[in-house]
Amino acid sequence: NLGLVKINGLDVNTQLHFVLPKNFYLTAKVQYTYQTAIDVTDPADNYYGHQIPYIPWHSGSAVGMFGWSNDWMQYHLNYSFIYVGERYNQQENILYNYTQPWYTHDLSLVGEWDIHKAQGKRLFTLRAALDVNNLLSQDYDVILNYPMPKRNYKCTISITY
């Protein structure tokens, strides 16, 4: 548990959406965060004024989506890149507690279909997705000594009423 923490930062988000011919579209999103979160509990502590554990100064993401849609179905291919910058795993910001930055690349392919009654009213939406997470099979720990999975796959089928 921490006492007093002083937090300052900046968040920047942007999104572009392009409508292309023949029902195609392209979307791009970028997010960046700069954050200082320093312990200001007790000036006598060795870690007074240090960045608190596991809070990076820099982090961000980039997402791209290429898709196609019509009145009752859509398909899209998604790419995402997530970056978490250097940080420390304990209260003291010393070399021994330093934690390397990490990043991942992920891909997904999604299809969605609206299923209708004969009168045209939508009954439900069927969605199928195939995800490939950590595409480059990076070794990284979000928390020290808790390694995240290397490349992994997920297949999802869902129905929404």
What do these predicted ranges mean?
Residues N1-L2, A44-I52, E92-N97, Y140-N145:
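Extracellular loop and loop/strand-boundary signature of outer-membrane beta-barrel proteins
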Residues H58-F66, Y103-G111, R151-I159:
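Feature captures outer-membrane beta-barrel proteins of Gram-negative bacteria and organelles
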